[in-house]
């Protein structure tokens, strides 16, 4: 098992190639990704989450906070926003160590390596940008991946539904199940762990081109 935080000596060619591949994929897409700065941009993430919860029937408006969905982890979290022009259309959240992380708290477990894991969650896409191919959601995953890597981490965890786990498998990305499915954030999800270096070679072979392969 590798350390969660990756230094220069551990940032091997395969992982670097995957980082470049994801950066190119996200950069070629129609969205721009940023980290929310200030209360106004955080509020955009909370409102996107609110709208997602309502549209899926997970909660009623009376159960939510004035058009916002948020919890105790949000003030210290990193919120990643995806923009279509000047409109925020998707969002996700990173809760940084040392923890306890949301997944650890919900499932009463510790994700190893302790204190070196980023919790990825609260991923939502505006109804206007949802489609059968889940293109915006895949780009959001890429934007969150890049932010995790930018902060020097190589291991992530989260609560993931069975359909999203299946999507990850189709993309060639293995997620390690840490426990059984259970109700979490209005849906049945299971705790999972993802290690960057584990699948880097296979992902680059599958989705990369000659540039990535030659630079490995």
Task: Indicate where each model-derived feature is located.
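Short acidic N-proximal helix/loop "leader" segments that mark the beginning
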Residues: 1-28
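Acyl-donor binding region in acyl/amide transferases
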Residues: 105-194, 198
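A short catalytic or substrate-binding loop motif that flags glycine-/basic-rich loops and adjacent residues
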Residues: 72-75, 83
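Short amphipathic alpha-helix that is part of the acyltransferase structural core
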Residues: 20-69, 79-81
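Short, P/G- and charge-enriched loop/turn segments at secondary-structure junctions
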Residues: 66-70, 106-109
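Charge-rich, low-complexity intrinsically disordered segments
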Residues: 187-216
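A short, polar/charged loop-to-alpha-helix boundary motif
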Residues: 60, 97-110
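Conserved beta-strand in the GNAT
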Residues: 81, 86-96
């Amino acid at each position: 098992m590798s350390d969660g935080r990756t230094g220069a000596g551990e940032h091997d060619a395969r992982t670097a190639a995957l980082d470049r591949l994801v950066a190119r994929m996200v950069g070629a897409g129609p969205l721009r990704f940023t980290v929310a700065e200030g209360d106004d941009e955080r509020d955009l993430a909370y409102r996107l989450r609110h709208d997602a919860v309502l549209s899926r029937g997970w909660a009623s408006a009376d159960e939510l906070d004035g058009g916002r969905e948020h919890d105790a982890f949000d003030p210290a979290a990193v919120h990643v926003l995806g923009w279509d022009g000047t409109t925020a259309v998707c969002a996700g959240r990173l809760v940084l160590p040392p923890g306890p992380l949301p997944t650890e708290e919900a499932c009463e477990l510790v994700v190893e390596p302790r204190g070196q894991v980023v919790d990825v969650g609260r991923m939502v896409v505006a109804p206007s940008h949802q489609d059968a191919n889940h293109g915006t959601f895949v780009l959001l995953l890429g934007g969150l991946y890049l932010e995790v890597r930018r902060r020097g981490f190589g291991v992530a965890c989260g609560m993931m539904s069975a359909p999203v786990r299946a999507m990850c498998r189709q993309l060639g990305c293995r997620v390690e199940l840490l426990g059984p499915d259970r109700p979490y954030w209005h849906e049945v999800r299971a705790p999972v762990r993802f290690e960057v270096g584990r699948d880097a070679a296979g992902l680059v072979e599958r989705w990369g081109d000659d540039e990535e392969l030659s630079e490995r």
